[in-house]
Structure formats: structure tokens, C-alpha cells
């Protein structure tokens, strides 16, 4: 019985950010994010979350972990019928946390990440994107583990 209780306690305990305690990080952009200027929109909300994380920012190689951003958007689709028919896009943001030694592939897939997704009529809303980045970053820091990409519902980021 004690083993069952202990197992339930361990399973119920959230994955803590303890493995990240005392670590340093660097934010990495893809070459296309950097070259296009898209990083100017992506980095500020991520940097704000990271500044409050307790991790130490590094300005160059040698950080313990690499934090990256992967964005995605579909081409949209009609949803609803009649007067309620609207064209919606699904946008998503994955915030990744990878060990410095992990080689992030070209498409940006991190060792660990949280993907926040949202259906919206306008895929270019900066406020929704900032909210998704913040949500995914906070969730990733809170639930960090060595590997896996996990979803989080992003509908709270939809502009009302």
C-alpha cells in the first residue's frame, strides 16, 4: 500500500524545472527568422519570460541550454455554415529547450518543447503570437524534461 501511495504522489507531482536550476541559456533563431527580421517580433516576449525564469542569459556559445522558437501556420479553411461561416487559420508556436550539445535540425525541432496552437481569422496578429510565445515558454519552463514535444491549448490567446 505504501508503494502505491508513493507511486501516486510521484505521478501527481508536476515535472519541476529543477533540472534547469542554475543553468544558463541562449536564444537561437533560425537563419530565416533572423534574416527576415521576424526575430524582432519573436524574441521580446520570449526574452521577457526567460528573464523571469531564474536562468542566466548568455551572449554566446557555452550556454547550458539553447532555447528556440518554431512557428507554423496553415493555409486556412472554412469553418461553420451560412452567416456563421468564417475562414480560420491554425497558428502554432513551439518553444524548445535543448541541451547545448544537441544539434537542432534545420526545421528547428528541439529535444524538448511545448507547442501552443490557436485557430484565428488573422494569422498575422502580433498580440496573439506574443501570447502563444509567452504561454509556450512558461509551460516549457514549468514542465521541462529531457525529451518530447507536448501540446498546450492556446485558445486563451485568441483576441476576443
Give the residues covered by each predicted segment:
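C-terminal/domain-edge helix-coil "capping" segments
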Residues: 18-22, 101-160
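Extended hydrophobic/Leu-rich segments
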Residues: 27-29, 69, 133
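Surface-exposed short loop/turn segments
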Residues: 63-111, 118, 122
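A structural "domain/chain start" motif
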Residues: 3, 7-54, 148-160
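Solvent-exposed loop and beta-edge segments used for protein-protein assembly and interaction
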Residues: 19-21, 61, 87
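Solvent-exposed, acidic/flexible segments
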Residues: 35-43, 86-88, 122-134
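Short acidic low-complexity segments
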Residues: 53-66
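Intrinsically disordered, low-complexity regions enriched in small/polar residues
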Residues: 5, 27, 40, 80, ...
Amino acid at each position: 500500500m505504501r508503494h502505491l501511495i508513493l507511486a501516486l504522489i510521484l505521478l501527481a507531482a508536476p515535472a519541476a524545472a529543477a533540472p534547469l536550476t542554475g543553468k544558463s541559456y541562449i536564444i537561437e533563431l533560425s537563419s530565416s527568422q533572423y534574416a527576415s527580421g521576424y526575430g524582432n517580433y519573436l524574441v521580446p516576449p520570449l526574452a521577457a519570460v526567460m528573464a523571469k525564469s531564474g536562468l542566466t542569459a548568455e551572449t554566446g556559445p557555452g550556454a547550458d541550454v539553447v532555447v528556440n522558437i518554431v512557428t507554423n501556420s496553415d493555409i486556412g479553411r472554412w469553418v461553420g455554415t451560412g452567416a456563421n461561416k468564417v475562414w480560420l487559420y491554425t497558428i502554432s508556436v513551439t518553444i524548445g529547450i535543448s541541451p547545448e550539445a544537441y544539434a537542432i535540425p534545420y526545421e528547428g525541432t528541439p529535444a524538448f518543447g511545448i507547442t501552443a496552437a490557436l485557430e484565428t481569422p488573422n494569422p498575422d496578429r502580433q498580440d496573439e503570437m506574443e501570447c502563444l510565445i509567452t504561454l509556450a515558454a512558461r509551460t516549457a519552463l514549468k514542465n521541462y524534461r529531457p525529451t518530447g514535444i507536448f501540446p498546450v491549448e492556446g485558445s486563451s490567446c485568441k483576441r476576443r
